[in-house]
Amino acid sequence: MFKKVLRLVVLCSLFPLPFSLLPGCGPFWVDPYITVQESSLNWVVIHYYNMSRQPIRRIGVEIYGNGLVVVKKGTSELVSNDFAKRNKDESWDNIKTSRLQIDPANVTGIFQNLVNNGLLDREKTFKASKKESQTRFIAVKANINNNTYSDNVNMFEEDPDLAEHLLDVVREFEQPSR
């Protein structure tokens, strides 16, 4: 009798185990070419470095779904890393920051263009024709409609077509006309 009760208790305790794993699972076939919805929770951060010059010229562009655009330029590590530690470096204070407010509908258009060019398509990124090492570096991190991309790779080497679209966005805000 005791063995039957013990067996029943063990079976009852193991029964929910497979179901406990299901909530963390999600479909891996989610379409990366989504229609971007206007949301203040969407954002894209692009870091561009021109390594053909010394010191390295850096540009950071942060675009938020509410229309805020933050552009950082200079040779300081602070352009791409808010937590940089080398404050004794001679280029530490070589940073200029500007903030722009644009129409959120225009931001949604920028995000949609990047999505249409494969920003969220992980398969495209790693299967694209790769180029040799570049003297330019561009990386992107994004959250668009709760779809994220945050691999810190040089897009000029991984996906040159997307890299050119990212560079176009950087150039659009690098020298804004007011």
What are these regions (language model features)?
Residues 1-26:
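Short, C-terminally biased terminal segments at protein or domain edges
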Residues 27-53, 120-178:
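Short, well-ordered, aromatic-rich surface patches in folded extracellular/luminal domains
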Residues 57-79:
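Short, flexible N-terminal segments of the mature chain
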Residues 60, 97-99, 150-152:
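Well-ordered beta-strand positions in beta-sheet-rich domains
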Residues 63, 110, 138-140:
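Residue-level detector of buried hydrophobic side-chain packing
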Residues 65-67, 75, 114, 144, ...:
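A mature extracytoplasmic/lumenal domain signature
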Residues 65-66, 100-107, 142-147:
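A short, structured loop/turn motif at beta-sheet edges
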Residues 72-122:
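A short-motif feature that recognizes glycine-rich, charge-decorated loops
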